[in-house]
């Protein structure tokens, strides 16, 4: 406790907030490469898919080129980040995301079980997002190359591609709500932008991870 200069009134000094390192530079780069490409692909895809938007924007051949070349750049950038970045950290992430324990099942049943670095919802979101990315790439290849070689034209590829877009759209809406709007969870954005989160927040939302990290210190 200190005193305000020029007065006898005591001034309470707020305790220093401890920060816990959450995401590495490689993890953050991978996330933002995927996110930025997704929004370009979603925007150009909607303009190609919705007649009202297609008529408003026009220039359909240019939109198709933007869509295709953004997809190619997205795949190349993801590969570059994985090859040039911290692969050991990414592999550890994959192992943790793929492992579900009793606390994860309890969390899904809203029992408030303590969570690790990724909660059960984040694990499911990552698995679904990865599956969607793979299916988008697969159906997108058949749509693009099928126009050039009819032997690769896959029936219903466009229908599947469109349905993947619907699923992704609503998945991203939920993701944006939790990371930008919901007061309880929006501090998580700090982890993926600045690489750290407050210890008090981590203890509330990822208690097992936070406790393990503080024990290492």
List where the protein language model places each region.
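Membrane-embedded alpha-helical bundles that constitute the cytochrome b-like, heme-associated redox core
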Residues: 1-217
């Amino acid at each position: 406790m200190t005193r305000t200069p020029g007065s006898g009134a005591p001034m309470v000094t707020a305790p220093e907030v401890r920060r816990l390192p959450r995401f590495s530079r490689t993890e953050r780069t991978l996330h933002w490469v995927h996110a930025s490409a997704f929004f370009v692909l979603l925007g150009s895809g909607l303009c190609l898919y919705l007649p009202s938007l297609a008529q408003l924007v026009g220039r359909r051949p240019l939109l198709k080129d933007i869509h295709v070349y953004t997809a190619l750049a997205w795949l190349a950038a993801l590969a570059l980040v994985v090859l040039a970045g911290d692969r050991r950290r990414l592999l550890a992430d994959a192992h943790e995301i793929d492992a579900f324990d009793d606390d994860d099942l309890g969390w899904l049943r809203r029992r408030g079980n303590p969570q690790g670095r990724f909660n059960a919802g984040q694990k499911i979101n990552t698995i679904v997002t990865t599956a969607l990315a793979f299916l988008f790439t697969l159906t997108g290849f058949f749509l693009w190359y099928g126009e050039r070689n009819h032997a690769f034209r896959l029936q219903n590829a466009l229908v599947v591609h469109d349905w993947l877009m619907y699923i992704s759209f609503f998945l991203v809406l939920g993701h944006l709500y939790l990371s930008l709007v919901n007061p309880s969870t929006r501090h998580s954005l700090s982890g993926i932008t600045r690489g750290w989160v407050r210890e008090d927040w981590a203890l509330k939302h990822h208690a097992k991870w936070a406790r393990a990290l503080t024990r290492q210190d």
